[in-house]
Amino acid sequence: MQRSVTAEESYRRGRDHLDRGEMQPALDHFRAAHQVDRANPRYRSFYGLGLALVERRFDRALELCRSAAKEEFFNPELYHNLARVHLAFGFKAEAIRYLRRGLMIDPGNGAMQEELRGLGLRRRPVLSFLPRRHPVNRLLGRFIRPWGVVEEEPAPEPQSA
């Protein structure tokens, strides 16, 4: 006799596969969890993440992840998923925005901190009224950087000519 798998078991198996980088099996388990319990924001968010990473369905993935984060706005993990969906489709600025939102809820979240660091954050110019490349900003930046006084900001997106 085969027992039915609960939504939570499917979700946990999906997380295990996701952590190992096995995206298709992760999506299958997240889909199963979502089908059993469509009201659960966590299952909905991870199902959306799986759709983005495996099937490249940005609109549906974004819809699922946003609705989950809206419902459970205090869960930083759901903002992390939103950021990962945006990153999968090249929307770096939006990803940074959602990572920061998640870190406002849980400042000690190592996964989100690491993801944010990996996106190549730059320091703000010392004198914001001067361009970043101005010699005075560059000189002051070299002296101030060792003390970590200047705040960080996202690296600008490359502009096409």
Regions found by a protein language model. Name each.
Residues 19-29, 54-67, 89-101, 125-131:
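Structural signature of tandem alpha-helical TPR/SEL1-like repeats
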Residues 1-12, 16-19, 70, 74, ...:
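Intrinsically disordered, low-complexity, charge-biased linker/tail regions
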Residues 62, 79-80, 95-99, 109, ...:
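Short amphipathic alpha-helical surface patches that serve as generic macromolecular interface elements
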